[in-house]
Design a protein with these regions (language model features):
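Conserved acidic catalytic loop of the alpha/beta-hydrolase fold
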Residues: 1-2
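Glycine-rich nucleophile elbow surrounding the catalytic serine of serine-hydrolase chemistry
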Residues: 8-18
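Active-site nucleophile elbow and catalytic-triad environment of alpha/beta-hydrolase enzymes
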Residues: 79-100
């Protein structure tokens, strides 16, 4: 069967990496453009932090927009977003990456990122890909640092997302990925992986046609 490849831009790229973390046996390659390796709290508890998901300008007003979520900073709520919830969502966790490496050293990671990304995520992305390589992952980060690297077709700017389209990303890298996997057969299998987070253990596993999360 064909390899399973996940990819995306910004948050989509983050989700692709997250799938590789919680279900490494279900993916062979990750394609990313400009994802943050760390959870962005404004998308989870932004209203309580006074940080909107986005801001829109309406004449003389800056209007902050928020996602409606169950998460809260209230320590007495069952929906309190704790450090454990943060850790399991973080890609940049050395302890978790060591566990992931036991299941996914053959997974191919390819990422593009601007060194001048306005969200300040470039250093974290460099650290993540350095850890990937140190742990034996097949990982390549294209860190765009200079305007000379802008071809105005594939990479158009040094801002977040590089002016790059998802279709452009796949057109650029998919032939390379398929060539790397040429002659290999991939079979679907069920698996299970557990990550310690503080006093909790998050276990992700296949069970029949379902993919389950158990927290103990």
């Amino acid at each position: 069967s064909l390899p399973i490849i996940y990819g995306g831009n910004s948050y989509g790229g983050y989700l692709a990496h997250l799938i590789a973390k919680i279900a490494p046996w279900h993916c062979q390659a990750i394609l990313d453009n400009s994802c943050s390796p760390l959870p962005q709290l404004e998308y989870l508890v932004g209203r309580e932090l006074g940080q909107g998901d986005a801001t829109t300008l309406d004449r003389d007003l800056n209007i902050k927009l928020y996602s409606k979520t169950f998460w809260t900073c209230d320590a007495n709520s069952k929906y309190c977003f704790t450090s454990e919830h943060y850790k399991i969502r973080s890609l940049l966790n050395a302890e978790h990456l060591k566990i992931q490496a036991k299941y996914a050293k053959d997974t191919l990671f390819i990422s593009y990122h601007s060194a001048y990304d306005e969200f300040g995520t470039a250093k974290d992305k460099e650290k993540l890909y350095e850890l990937y390589r140190a742990l034996g992952f097949k990982a390549k980060l294209h860190l765009i640092k200079d305007e000379k690297e802008l071809d105005k077709k594939f990479i158009r700017s040094l801002k977040h997302s590089l002016g790059m389209s998802d279709s452009g990303l796949f057109r650029k890298e998919l032939p390379f990925i398929l060539e790397k996997f040429k002659g290999k057969n991939f079979t679907q299998r069920q698996g299970e992986i557990s990550y310690p987070c503080g006093d909790k253990i998050f276990t992700f596993k296949d069970e029949g046609e379902k993919f389950l999360l158990e927290i103990s």
